[in-house]
Amino acid sequence: MKDGWLPREEWLKMLEARPASAAVLIENSAGELLIVKAHYKPHWGVPGGVIDAGETPLQAALREVAEEVGLTLRPADLTFYAVASRHSSEAMLYQFVFRARLDNERLAAIVLADGEIETYEFVSRQAVLASDQQFVWSIQHWAEGKLGGYVETNMKRDGNQRHETVTQYIAITKKEETWEH
């Protein structure tokens, strides 16, 4: 360290150690959530993936939705939902999660990515809560009707299964709070 600053190469290498991803919770007109099953994952998730170099979380979210389910979203279609700090023994990952509610006409344009997404379905909150299946934290929070905000998770692998536990949750605001300008 020179004069309190890390050498640029060390600083850049440190930044590479904390990758980030983006995902989108997409609801239909009935309030059901679009979930996808990738060929290479044992669990269901939502459209999303790693943020490429030079991309913002918003750009990555829009790109991943287009790549995985063939939907072209605009920034105005999205609202911010949450940011998560996901921890495992292998890595730490930031995940930026957005929400979109689309009419069924737009959702009729879904085309699955060849070789990546196996299938998709729309699920209700009740179906997620009643299921004994393990869902990623964002699907579980959506089903529980939790407000967005900040989330920390701990991910563990057990063979081919991944278990993710929320260890911290701070709501973006409380339902009774309002923000006045």
Kindly give the residue locations of the regions a language model identified.
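Short Gly/Pro-enriched turn/cap motifs at secondary-structure boundaries
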Residues: 12-16, 89, 112
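Conserved Nudix-box catalytic region and its N-terminal flanking loop in Nudix hydrolases
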Residues: 28-67, 177, 181
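Nudix hydrolase/Nudix homology domain
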Residues: 42-43, 115-181
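Active-site-adjacent beta-strand/loop module that shapes the phosphate/pyrophosphate-binding cleft
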Residues: 84-109, 121, 141-146
